Amino acid sequence: MKHIILAILFFIMVSGLSACTTSQPIQNVEKQVITSTASDEEVRQAITDAATSLGWVIVADHGNEITAVIDVRTHQATVSIPYSSSNYSIIYKNSIDLNHSGGKIHRNYNRWVANLDQEIRRNLNIAKTHH
């Protein structure tokens, strides 16, 4: 009986520790379809407006690809955002102090990318209504 109780306690302890983990698989945004009729320039503007409004800094903007960096306290993430008039992607490029290892990263990175994606889509919908 004592062994069963110890085994149950061990299982609960291990389960509790795994629930506290902050690492998740990296969630890239791959070929997000743009449903509005937008030019490459309008898509670029929607991306840069979204990024800067959320604290991302555009560090490169060449040939339908934007590189953006976000710094939050000691953490930094860099993404590549290739785009066209029909789709865009947000791809992990590099990070500092986000526990990147084996395709996993701190969950805040995925939240930052999801927020960026949502804001880009919102900006594209606003641009669509102004046509």
Where is each model-derived feature located?
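Positively charged n-region of N-terminal signal peptides that target proteins for export
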Residues: 1-4
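Sec-dependent N-terminal signal peptides
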Residues: 6-13
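C-terminal motif of bacterial Sec signal peptides marking the signal peptidase cleavage site
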Residues: 15-19
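Ser/Thr-rich, low-complexity intrinsically disordered terminal regions
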Residues: 21-131
